[in-house]
Amino acid sequence: MPGDEQRERTADDAVTEPSRIARLIAVVAGIAGVLLCGLVPLLPVEETTATVLWPQGVGADGNVTELTAPLVAGAPRALDVTIPCRAVAELPADGGVVFSTNPAGGIEAGRNGMFIRANADVVYVAFRDTVAAVAPREAVDSGACSEIHVWADVSAVGADFAGIPDASGTLPVDKRPQVSGVFTDLKVPAQPGLAARIDIDTRFITSPTLLKTAVMVLGLACVIGSIVALALLDRGWRRRPARTRGRAGLWTWITDTGVIGGLLIWHIVGAPTSDDGYNMTIARVASEAGYTTNYYRYFGASEAPFDWYQSVLSHLASISTAGVWMRLPATAAAIATWLIISRCVLPRIGRRVAANRVAMLTAGATFLAAWLPFNNGLRPEPLIAFAVITVWMLVENSIGTRRLWPAAVAIVIAMFSVTLAPQGLIALAPLLVGARAIGRVVTARRAAPGSWRPCPLAASVAVVFVIIFRDQTLATVAESVRIKYVVGPTIPWYQEFLRYYFLTVEDSVDGSLTRRFAVLVLLLCLFGLIMVLLRRGRVPGAVSGPLWRLCGSTAIGLLLLILTPTKWAIQFGAFAGLAGALGGVTAFAFARVGLHSRRNLALYVTALLFILAWATSGLNGWFYVGNYGVPWFDKQPVIAHYPVTTIFLVLAIVGGLLAGWLHFRMDYAGHTEVADTGRNRALASTPLLIVATIMVVLELGSMVKATVGRYPVYTVGSANIAALRSAGDSCAMADAVLVEADPNEGMLQPVPGQRFGDYGPLGGEDPVGFTPSGVSEHLEPEPVGTNPGTPNSEGPVDKPNIGIAYAGDTGGGYAPEGVNGSRVFLPFGLDPSRTPVMGSYGENKLAAKATSAWYQLPPRTPDRPLVTVAAAGAIWYYEEDGSFNYGQSLKLQWGVHRPDGTYQALSEVQPIDIFQQKAWRNLRFPLAWAPPEANVARIVADDPNLSEDQWCAFTPPRVPVLQTAQQFLGSQTPVLMDIATAANFPCQRPFAERLGVAELPEYRIIPNFKQMVVSSNQWQSAADGGPFLFIQALLRTEAIPTYLRDDWYRDWGSIERYIRVVPQEQAPTAAIEEGSTRVFGWSRGGPIRALP
């Protein structure tokens, strides 16, 4: 209107001219900040170089020794080998290995490595089972060639028998071999011409040069100076009064207390996330590795451009690795996010909204319901959620106060969010939604020269270059990204719907009822508010601009998720803050909508009931140990034997019918509003509050019940409580897992004086159908399947992921003859000279049965709680909930051996088995089940089933002295902890990586069988650049019997011992020559080999 324009013109005339100095600083510092920060990716860095030379000394016999040097990247940057041809003549006539980069006894040694082999006829050089050059053995031995020269680098791969015509060749560069050391059968002393040089790929081990550091410091100083100058310029303008926030009311304080209290409880008892172990291990090894290496995959590539958060975690881990300490950033982000919602977001949307107690309580309940299922771990979503809500607040501050410095700070925070993880892009959503309003603020200052306006904002964007490239270069970050796309898994943008599909998958953590509810409520609030705004134009009592921008930020954020290369449902956790704010406004808006129309209220309640029905069709599932003791973790919730999902679905149908009746009734009765009474206002405003509170109570109650109800049996909550009580000195699951250090020591001995047949005391007097070799040669277990969307799995996205595996040495086979004539390969390190075997495999004509001799039980002590039996085949057992698993009967019978030499048989007990399989495992018989007078026990086996797949085998009973995993492993032994287990074993040391070479682990800690098959073994695979790349080349495994204290039915996981294929004495760890070189940001040095 003309009057308004006149007043605005008068106000502009009254504006004080901003300081020329401040404007000059804003322009110059902004431009300098952009240029300096933009140069950071290209500036030189100091790259640490590492080289292994061979030979490195001689053995006791005076001959060269082998070396162990497992390269994290697999292939070296360059390999150069020369072998004098006369040295080949020292091999036997049938030949041997002249030189290899993998030991011949390793898994797929030739497929991955380089071998120079000699046989009786020829000498050949092969890279990854592809021959590069071959020469007659006679010509090589006779001295027709001077040397064998082999090379492999980023430009060429080849071999040459110098002096022999047509005995050379080259191969494509993708044939560069894996190097895990230097291995040879040659028995020769060090001599001229016998040499190998391995240049390790250390491109990611970089540190900024003095020049780069100075440029980064100056660039950040310029950015800060530009923003400060912008703030001073903002002060120089007479602006509209900002919308003032009243003092927080009583219900705000009450809600703050409830939300923060719930978050603190969840900090102690809450379930971990699927990537806690992943990020924990990366953080723990980063310091020695020299960069944030991807420990479990991708050939040791850097985590850049998303690595600054792991750097923070690395500093935290240097203080303590206890879960309650490492999860502090997530809990702090949660508290800060909520306080911004309650003190800034809701007041900005409307003072009446913030003062409405139902809106405030609903915001708190919805926030908790959205936060708890996703954000209680070491993943980046908690920080992203905080960044999103902070950016929205700053954007609103900039728009409301007509100042630009809050927008500049918002951009900086958004840049930190973007570099947290790909889903951090959603922090850009508030900036995109508010860009038009901020643009009007910029153009409104037409009294001042316009050239300075975008400079501070552009400088804020340029900070992203410093965050990403602070110690990496443009080339190394590009290479890291390339490897991750080559290896995968990645999902294209047009399959974004899979993220939502994963929420619907049953028997999946991502499809759990709590995560379904959080996302469905977010979508209901978003689309519900948009419908109200489109239908009515505004929400009475709320400011339309901020409300539209809140909805727009959420919608744009969901669209930005399309750009992420992965589609894990857990990434929805980044919307937890927005969900809380939307929940509060939805309760406020729909209270008025419900009062306006009974039909609309019925539709609102029906939608919530349908959400509950859909959500409760999933499991109350949590990741790994988070399930321990939780009700309904493996099935849909039930009440009085009725599925809860059915109850809510029936109620939703009733609500829908009621809404339909009210809709058609309007044609006859006309529009009727609901009486504005306290009761009706409560009915209209509280449905979402009630529903969200139910879900929060379920989440908190489930975990508190698990912690209290199972105490002192292991749970996440009990581990965290122990950490708090011991000031972080407890060792979580390592204090609860019990280990048989030597199964042979716990083996029971038969009572002397008994009679038994040819098969010894284990077979008893007259076994039928059971023999010492009655075990199948192949004990491959049944395939294990998991549904689509399983985190850290590379299975197909549209169908179940199927895998087959068994632990250590439990897969069967043959071995030298044992104590009772058995030729069965024994698991768990059992000594065949002391361990007899009896089995019914192959007996398909008679009902097999056997009763062993009586074995003497030792005195009962706390460290010997179990009788265990190593067994194989199909065995009858009951699970803890009473469900039955079919197999053949293998029982333990208690007895009494009296002084007069007689025996009294007592009760028989079925074993505890952890899951159906044929492979060797340890059956458990708690001594608490034994009658007090029992002092002997025997095995009673009965196999009447003649089917080929129905048989059982067993070894003598054991009563081992058990020690904790912490006592067994200690805190200095190098260990491979799988992704799922790493966060639960904070005291164990992950094997180190230094100068691009991995330390060989001595043990592996594995999660439960299903998790191992469908996640660990796939994600950490050799083909994808995981630790199995060198482990399968250099180590073999042996399973160790373990149990979870007082939770004997639990398949918690297992521990495996690694045994070197080539002993340490024969192939000691290589000495590495360390150096440094200066490289510029564009220097690539060739690609890392990231192919299968």
From Swiss-Prot:
InterPro entries: Arabino_trans_C, Arabino_trans_C_2, Arabino_trans_central, Arabino_trans_N, EmbABC_dom1. GO terms for biological process: Actinobacterium-type cell wall biogenesis; cell wall organization; response to antibiotic. One of its GO terms (cellular component) is plasma membrane. The chain crosses the membrane at residues 21-43, 214-233, 249-271, 324-346, 353-372, 382-399, 404-426, 517-534, 541-563, 568-590, 602-624, 639-661, 682-704. It is found in: Cell membrane. Keywords: Antibiotic resistance, Cell membrane, Cell wall biogenesis/degradation, Glycosyltransferase, Membrane, Transferase, Transmembrane, Transmembrane helix. GO terms for molecular function: arabinosyltransferase activity. It is a multi-pass membrane protein. Residues 772-798 are annotated as: Disordered. Its EC number is 2.4.2.-. It holds the Pfam family Arabinose_trans. Belongs to the emb family. Arabinosyl transferase responsible for the polymerization of arabinose into the arabinan of arabinogalactan. This is one of the targets of the anti-tuberculosis drug ethambutol [(S,S')-2,2'-(ethylenediimino)di-1-butanol; EMB]. EMB is a first-line drug used to treat tuberculosis. EMB inhibits the transfer of arabinogalactan into the cell wall. This is Probable arabinosyltransferase A. It comes from Mycolicibacterium smegmatis.
